[in-house]
From Swiss-Prot:
The keyword Disulfide bond does not apply. SUPFAM superfamilies: ClpP/crotonase. Gene3D superfamilies: 2-enoyl-CoA Hydratase, Chain A, domain 1. GO terms for molecular function: acetyl-CoA carboxylase activity; ATP binding; carboxyl- or carbamoyltransferase activity. This is Acetyl-coenzyme A carboxylase carboxyl transferase subunit beta. It holds the Pfam family Carboxyl_trans. It is an enzyme of class 2 (transferase). Acetyl-CoA carboxylase is a heterohexamer composed of biotin carboxyl carrier protein (AccB), biotin carboxylase (AccC) and two subunits each of ACCase subunit alpha (AccA) and ACCase subunit beta (AccD). Component of the acetyl coenzyme A carboxylase (ACC) complex. Biotin carboxylase (BC) catalyzes the carboxylation of biotin on its carrier protein (BCCP) and then the CO(2) group is transferred by the transcarboxylase to acetyl-CoA to form malonyl-CoA. Its EC number is 2.1.3.15. It catalyses: N(6)-carboxybiotinyl-L-lysyl-[protein] + acetyl-CoA = N(6)-biotinyl-L-lysyl-[protein] + malonyl-CoA.
Length: 301
């Protein structure tokens, strides 16, 4: 009877048993509630086909979609002290870091990539919101500076995709130090005469908007992105007034002159390639989609 109980019965159970469905097989559209098949979403760069809603995207996926043929080289993340303040809230900061590293496979919230877009060599830096809300700490700050320095070394244009909740509170003043440090790196790039394009994605808030994310030569925003220093709820509680509808959205900011254009993720590569070719005085691709421009009333404002 042992072979029946040990082999036959488990085999039958495995054949007849209910197969578990992966949790991430279907993705819910936050704007409409529609369920979208994961593979359909990924093939569309994580933009909902029906509504155009831009889902958050992992850094490595962002680079894969952005670079020619999905090919790029990443820079090794700089080594920094993990927890110099020995900070603890609900759990030790160092344990929280280890948890996020295990879940994301990343050292910190920044990934630097080297590759080409439409044949033009560039350096691209991506902030990943899935790693502690894309917060800016020593590791992230050092990686951003590394990206700027590599662009200067190779004499390449620099593109940064911002997505962050702001400074990393667990690192205190050491986190805030990254604001002036990254600002200096921006100035170094500009002194080298190299283009700097910033893509503001959802969300880009806090100290990031008080430093490198708003210092680009050109600022592009993805549709529907939340962009601002403090969140709308905090502002309403402070001034005790209701904010205008769509306040701090990418479209609102473009209408009021805070960003240069709002571009769908599906058109970002072609748009940025055309802009960089113009900025570096190379022949531009006439087939690239034209950027969205503010109307006359917006210009007057």
């Amino acid at each position: 009877m042992n072979w029946i109980t040990n082999y036959v019965r488990p085999k039958i159970n495995s054949m007849l048993g209910r197969r578990e469905m992966p949790e991430n097989l279907w993705i819910k559209d936050p704007s409409t509630g529609e369920m979208v098949f994961h593979k359909d979403l990924e093939s569309n760069q994580f933009v909902i086909p029906s509504s155009g809603h831009h889902m958050r995207i992992k850094a490595k996926d962002r680079l894969r979609f952005f670079f020619d043929n999905g090919e790029y080289t990443t820079l090794e993340a700089p080594k920094v002290p993990l927890d110099p303040l020995k900070f603890r809230d609900e759990k030790k900061y160092i344990d929280r870091l280890k948890d996020y590293r295990s879940r994301t496979g990343m050292d910190d919230a920044i990934v630097n990539g080297l590759g080409t877009i439409e044949g033009l060599p560039i350096v691209a830096t991506v902030q990943d919101f899935s790693f502690m809300g894309g917060s800016l700490g020593m590791g992230a700050g050092e990686a951003i500076i590394q990206g700027f320095e590599k662009a200067i070394e190779l004499k390449r244009p620099f593109v940064l995709f911002a997505s962050s909740g702001g400074a990393r509170m667990q690192e205190g003043i050491l986190s805030l130090m990254q604001l002036p440090r990254t600002t200096v790196a921006v100035e170094m790039l500009k002194e080298a005469g190299l283009p700097y394009i910033v893509v503001l994605t959802n969300p880009t808030t806090g100290g990031v908007t008080a430093s490198y994310a708003m210092l680009g030569d050109i600022h592009i925003a993805e549709p529907g992105a939340l962009i601002g220093f403090a969140g709308p709820r905090v502002i309403e509680q402070t001034i005790r007034e209701k904010l205008p509808e769509g306040f701090q959205s990418s479209e609102y900011l473009m209408e009021h002159g805070m960003v240069d254009m709002v571009v769908s993720r599906l058109e970002l590569k072609a748009t940025i390639a055309r802009l960089l070719k113009i900025m570096t005085k190379q022949p531009a691709n006439s087939d690239a989609p034209a950027p969205q421009k503010p109307d006359a009333d917006s210009k007057a404002a």
